[in-house]
Curated annotation (Swiss-Prot):
Species of the source: Autographa californica nuclear polyhedrosis virus (AcMNPV)
Gene, per the UniProt record: IE1
One Pfam family it belongs to: TATR
Domain notes: The N-terminal region is required for origin-specific DNA replication and phosphorylation.
One CC-aspect GO term: nuclear viral factory
Lineage: Viruses, Viruses incertae sedis, Naldaviricetes, Lefavirales, Baculoviridae
Name under which the protein is recorded: Trans-activating transcriptional regulatory protein
Domain of life: Viruses
Entry keyword set: DNA replication, DNA-binding, Early protein, Host nucleus, Phosphoprotein, Transcription, Transcription regulation, Viral DNA replication
Post-translation changes: Phosphorylated.
A single GO molecular function term of this UniProt record: DNA binding
GO BP, sorted A to Z: DNA replication; viral DNA genome replication; viral genome replication
Signal peptide interval: none
Length: 582
């Protein structure tokens, strides 16, 4: 009989399938019951009479039938399926390393073949409600593809902690080791970073270890940690601290005396720990949702550090002011080129310098994706007005917000009225009914229908372009009453309402729009901003709806603005800002 090559489908010694399932034909035979092996391999003299029982004859017939029916493609397919299942088997090995599983005797070739034939005829491989994965496991358990006993080890790859803890004390971090073994010493790396990024390329021999240095570099889980702090000589200084696994523990252990309130700017493997007091002195506006704890809380324990991982426009402002982009770029360049080796690095640098000299580097057809909507137009194309904005101005031309005197009952029961469940949604028609119809703070309020025409307005997705157009189109609409609701990516919301010469803004932290900059650029009228604090998405939606109810009470005159501001800041996790222009 021709020997079957069970290793035909995987010839590379580096593959996990070969390492775990390098079964030769002899190993296959070693695992079979002795009665079949003795029948198949027993030397029978020519012409000799051999006494064979009926059971042996039947088993031998079944075995030969099963072997003859298996083609090379069937065996390869079986091995491929087994290989696909290896990852799961290996990943759970550590989990049950200490458990000794009972050794189960392998079924005979005939029984295995019949079981396989039965499962195939029953449609085991067909998808069903019970799941394909479970049935594939059953197939592998009953097949000849896997033999022997395996301890399932649960392997978890290294990962880096990408989130920033909100606070950490010296007592918590003193026993945490954040050091990462580096090729160069910390003193040498510090010397490099403090000498204007002087060239420091380590030389590697062409051996197996160093040939993987690029892959090792890309899979590193540590962070290059920089500390941005005050300086007695310069406005500020940026120092390289260490290459660590956790910047929070490292900072709390060794830099808590710099400032125990820290803004963290993260770019890939580089993290900048920026002093809160330094940012306050620079005059950079700190968004309410990204602010750190107050002075009283920080002063209670100087060894307890508070951290905020910044993002969006605030992150961009800090990056621009402290030139963090330059530190990131140079650090990334050097560490990446170092991992490539001297020859590749020299080639790339030569090519890049040539591209820099002939300006090709700045004219390549490469474009960074914009954060804003594709609807953004240039100044010359601003004459095109969004249909959404046009409809708002058209259908709100003849309507006004209801005008009422301040109501003591509403003011005294503001918490109950605003937090009461309602059918309010973020559709334009639903918000129009809330703002333009009499607010039913109790059942005796007469109903009206001032918002019928506004139901024709078709809402569009939010963008900076639409916000600017809405403001621009209202420049000459001094006595108009209208509003706009905008939904951005990640369910971020922005509501703007206009009553005569006053605008009311409700928003959280919006990635695509810096509301303060938009108002400063507009430079007209009076603006009241209600900015929702740092909450999750669900809470932000609830708070936005409650602020819409509060806004309706303000616009209809039922609640004085001062009382509304106090309530919003105390009960709705909101910060109020005011901008006024001539």
């Amino acid at each position: 009989m021709t020997q079957i090559n069970f290793n035909a489908s995987y010839t590379s010694a580096s593959t996990p399938s070969r390492a775990s399932f390098d079964n030769s034909y002899s190993e296959f035979c070693d695992k079979q019951p002795n009665d079949y092996l003795s029948y198949y391999n027993h030397p029978t003299p020519d012409g000799a009479d051999t006494v064979i029982s009926d059971s042996e004859t039947a088993a031998a017939s079944n075995f030969l039938a099963s072997v003859n029916s298996l083609t090379d493609n069937d065996l390869v397919e079986c091995l491929l399926k087994t290989t696909d299942n290896l990852e799961e088997a290996v990943s759970s090995a550590y989990y049950s390393e200490s458990l000794e599983q009972p050794v189960v005797e392998q079924p005979s070739p005939s029984s295995a073949y019949h079981a396989e034939s039965f499962e195939h005829s029953a449609g085991v491989n067909q998808p069903s409600a019970t799941g394909t994965k479970r049935k594939l496991d059953e197939y592998l358990d009953n097949s000849q593809g896997v033999v022997g006993q395996f301890n399932k080890i649960k392997l978890r790859p290294k990962y880096k902690k990408s989130t920033i803890q909100s606070c950490a004390t010296l007592e918590q971090t003193i026993n945490h080791n954040t050091n990462i073994c580096t090729v160069a010493s910390t003193q040498e790396i510090t010397h490099y970073f403090t000498n204007d990024f002087a060239p420091y390329l380590m030389r590697f021999d062409d051996n197996d270890y160093n040939s993987n240095r690029f892959s090792d570099h890309m899979s590193e889980t540590g962070y290059y940690m920089f500390v941005v702090k005050k300086s007695e000589v310069k406005p500020f200084e940026i120092i390289f601290a260490k290459y660590v696994s956790n910047v929070v523990y490292e900072y709390t252990n060794n830099y808590y005396m710099v400032d125990n309130r820290v803004f963290v700017v993260t770019f890939d493997k580089i993290r900048f720990m920026i002093s809160y007091n330094l940012v306050k002195e620079t005059g950079i506006e700190i968004p309410h949702s990204q602010d750190v704890c107050n002075d009283e809380t920080a002063a209670q324990n100087c060894k307890k550090c508070h951290f905020v991982d910044v993002h969006h426009t605030f992150k961009a402002a800090l990056t621009s002011y402290f030139n963090l982009d330059m530190y990131y770029a140079q650090t990334t360049f050097v560490t990446l080129l170092q991992s490539l080796g001297e020859r590749k690095c020299g080639f790339l640098l030569s090519k890049l310098y040539e591209m820099y000299q002939d300006k090709n580097l700045f004219t390549l057809p490469i474009m960074l994706s914009r954060k804003e909507s594709n609807e953004i137009e240039t100044a010359s194309n601003n004459f095109f007005v969004s249909p959404y904005v046009s409809q708002i101005l058209k259908y709100s031309e003849s309507v006004q917000f209801p005008d009422n005197p301040p109501n003591k009952y509403v003011v005294d029961n503001l918490n109950l009225i605003v937090n009461k469940k309602s059918t309010l949604t973020y559709k334009y028609s639903s918000v129009a009914n809330l703002l333009f119809n009499n607010y039913k703070y109790h059942d005796n309020i007469a109903s009206n229908n001032n918002a019928e025409n506004l139901k024709k307005v078709k809402k569009e997705d939010g963008s900076m372009h639409i916000v600017e157009q809405y403001l621009t189109q209202n420049v000459d609409n001094v006595k108009g009453h209208n509003f706009i609701v905008l939904s951005f990516k990640n369910e971020e919301r922005l509501t703007i309402a206009k009553k005569n010469k006053e605008f009311y803004w409700i928003s959280g932290e919006i990635k695509d729009v810096d509301v303060s900059q938009v108002i400063q650029k507009y430079n007209r009228f009076k603006h009241h901003m209600f900015v929702i604090g740092k909450v999750n998405r669900r809470e932000s939606t609830t708070l936005h709806n409650n602020l819409l109810k509060l806004l309706a009470l303000i616009l209809q005159g039922l609640v004085p603005l001062s009382d509304a501001i106090t309530f919003a800041e105390q009960k709705l996790n909101c910060k109020y800002k005011k901008f006024e222009f001539n």
